């Protein structure tokens, strides 16, 4: 009997370990897609095709996984009054808004404004209701997750850094792995930089390197790099 249960347990772990999330492979970028984004200036020349391909592949896998996070918390499809924003809250959606990236991200700089950017634009703020209206639609499988940093005082420092550095500034939109500059940026870079540079002595993770250069950061992987965070709200 013990051997029987041991076999069942082993099979369970093997199944769990091989579980993967299905995604539409036609959404993976071709070299033509990559070259076009580079020519348009949306994607930095330092980003290799291989880095970009892996970034999008990982994002597609995360899209399915994070979309299931609603099981962990109360799901909401109402107005903004159902959630109280705190400075430093991280907003992540699978809505493909930022050209060149799967998903979109923003950071709350106070209790009313969410700072982000997108192709052809400079950083700007929008309300929570705007994000709900545009980035949460269950019928189209578009979801919006809100992640909260464990230490509220530090989260506010990140929010202030983002506001001071990017709100009302003319930073151009460009996706690459150069996190030392604020002259050009993209949605998830703003959030990552806010926590990396806004909090003294923080230990925020970096994306992988290739040939000495960092890969861009996927909006859908921000909660992996910025820790400790937890899912605070899920809008569908």
Regions found by a protein language model. Give the residues of each.
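N-terminal propeptides/leader regions of secreted preproproteins
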Residues: 19-79
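Sec-dependent N-terminal signal peptides of Gram-positive bacterial secreted proteins and lipoproteins
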Residues: 1-23
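Intrinsically disordered, low-complexity, charged/polar segments
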Residues: 128-152, 157, 214-229, 233-236
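Activation targets extended, charge/polar-rich intrinsically disordered C-terminal tails
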Residues: 28, 178-236
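Stable alpha-helical elements in mature extracytoplasmic
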Residues: 154-162, 183, 187-190
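Internal catalytic-core helix/loop-beta-alpha segment
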Residues: 155-175
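Glycine-rich catalytic cores of cysteine/serine-nucleophile enzymes that process amide/ester linkages
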Residues: 83-148, 172-182
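Sec-exported extracytoplasmic/periplasmic mature domains
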Residues: 110, 163-167, 192-200
